[in-house]
Amino acid sequence: MSNGGSFTVEKLSLYGNPNIGVYLTASDSYVLAPDDIGADDVRTISEVLGVAMERVVRLRVLGMRLVGVLTTGNSRGILLPEGVDREVELVRKALEGVEVGIVPTRSNALGNVIVCNDRACLASPGLEKEALKTVSDTLGVEVVEGSVAGVYTVGSAIVVTNRGGLAHPDASEEELKFLSDVFKVPFEAGTINFGVEFVRTGLVANSYGALVGEDTTGPEIARIQVALGGGVK
């Protein structure tokens, strides 16, 4: 994917909530969103993240709007929890060519325990071997287990694209280097939504842009721009 060009960061609220990350999953080739978000929100998501509107797929997962919590993926594949037969068919029909994997694990909150870009995946320690194999096979990347800043729900504490990454503000220099080595992109530490440490809860990004919660401050946005845009300002 492109490592050059502009990188847009724009504020968004969904259902009056700045925690937009719990509702959305994004890669360079698609976005998953709740089935009842408005047309204006779909248009904003499409424009900022550079994804065609027909590839902003609206659905519920296990009957819930929390798409960003329950799913994750990269440009090659999407990971869904068990018990989602209808959703699997919907995604496969909408996103031809994208792999869909059902992860056999005790945790339905895949977005909290798995974080990935198109080069690698970091999973919370303790995920079952069969689950890790499904993740690797579906996404086409190596899976590494680890935690960041004492946080085992790594998917809530990290946002990474193919250009850069933003991690929990308590991540050490050694941890930031570890993340950079795993994902093959530079990493920064930061916050969203006026000091929230779990950056994924209010931040959704790909190589082309980022959407942040409405409470995110100017300095936080500047940090996100540099971290996820690969230094583009």
Curated annotation (Swiss-Prot):
Q: Name one GO biological process term.
A: cytosolic ribosome assembly
List keywords of the entry alphabetically. Answer: Initiation factor, Protein biosynthesis
The family note in this entry says: Belongs to the eIF-6 family.
Which organism is this protein's natural source?
Aeropyrum pernix (strain ATCC 700893 / DSM 11879 / JCM 9820 / NBRC 100138 / K1)
Alphabetized InterPro entries for the sequence: eIF6 (IPR002769)
Job description of the protein: Binds to the 50S ribosomal subunit and prevents its association with the 30S ribosomal subunit to form the 70S initiation complex.
Q: Please give the name of this protein.
A: Translation initiation factor 6
Give any Pfam family that matches.
eIF-6
Q: Organism's domain of life?
A: Archaea
